[in-house]
């Protein structure tokens, strides 16, 4: 609906365009592309973002030279309402075993990442049941299993701040992060130390959500997040 398929026609047969007949969400679109891909590496470009020239070349070279890393990602230039802004401290980037850093919020932009296609056979595809935070869910599944490398170069431009963005339209994204955290607790690769970290983060998010819903008069949802805390032995 954003005119992408029309733009692709200018490239002739050099690019293969795969379309859904109806909007099934970003996860379904990514998953279909992954399943149709023939190459050994996968990269995404969301509609609001731009790749800087040379991005793919730099990442391919890194993954070729570092077979023990399944994924690398880059730094970003942020544009909000047409003006360049500096990311906040909470969006800082890290290399290595970054699972703990990925728990509060999503620090990897999908458009900045490149990964080996065989990674999806190890961690699964994007969760199509999540309308937002599907990337948060995916990065957690990756980072709890593998180290991730940060390329300290600004190789994508993230444009945001307009009202039609999906992330701008979804109130309380932590609701979906809690779902992702609950899912993670059932993963056999999650050890006791990681489990404790997940529960601490879940407690923070459930406390905020519960208080927020009670404040807005939604007692049903407020009690729901208290019940999640009780289920995992978290004191209220």
Regions found by a protein language model. Name each.
Residues 7, 20-37, 58:
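Glycine-rich, basic loop-to-helix element that forms the pyrophosphate-binding segment
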Residues 1-6, 22, 46:
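A conserved acidic beta->alpha catalytic loop
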Residues 160-236:
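C-terminal subregions of glycosyltransferases and related glycan-biosynthesis enzymes
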Residues 46-50, 75:
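The conserved acidic donor/metal-binding loop of glycosyltransferases
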Residues 54-86:
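Conserved donor NDP-sugar-binding/catalytic core segment of glycosyltransferases
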Residues 38, 52-53, 116:
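GHKL-family ATP-binding catalytic core of two-component histidine kinases
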Residues 35, 92-180:
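Conserved nucleotide-sugar donor-binding catalytic segment
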Residues 42:
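Short aromatic/hydrophobic "clamp" motif used to bind/position activated sugar donors
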């Amino acid at each position: 609906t954003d005119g992408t398929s029309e733009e692709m026609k200018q490239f002739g047969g050099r690019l293969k365009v795969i379309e859904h007949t109806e909007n099934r969400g970003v996860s379904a679109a990514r998953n279909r592309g992954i399943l149709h891909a023939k190459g050994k590496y996968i990269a995404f470009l969301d509609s609001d973002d731009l790749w800087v020239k040379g991005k793919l070349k730099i990442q391919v070279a890194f993954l070729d030279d570092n077979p023990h890393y399944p994924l690398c990602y880059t730094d970003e230039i942020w544009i909000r309402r047409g003006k360049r802004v500096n990311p906040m401290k909470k969006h800082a980037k890290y290399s290595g075993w970054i699972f703990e850093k990925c728990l509060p919020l999503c620090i990897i932009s999908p458009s900045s990442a490149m990964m080996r296609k065989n990674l999806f056979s190890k961690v699964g595809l994007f969760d199509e049941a999540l309308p937002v935070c599907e990337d948060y869910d995916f990065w957690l599944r990756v980072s709890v299993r593998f180290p991730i490398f940060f390329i300290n170069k600004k190789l994508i431009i993230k444009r945001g701040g307009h009202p039609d963005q999906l992330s701008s339209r979804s109130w309380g994204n932590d609701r979906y992060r809690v779902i992702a955290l609950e899912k993670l607790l059932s993963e056999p690769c999650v050890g006791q130390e990681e489990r404790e970290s997940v529960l601490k983060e879940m407690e923070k998010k459930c406390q905020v959500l519960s208080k927020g819903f009670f404040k807005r008069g939604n007692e049903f949802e407020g009690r729901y997040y208290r019940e999640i805390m009780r289920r995992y032995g978290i004191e209220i």
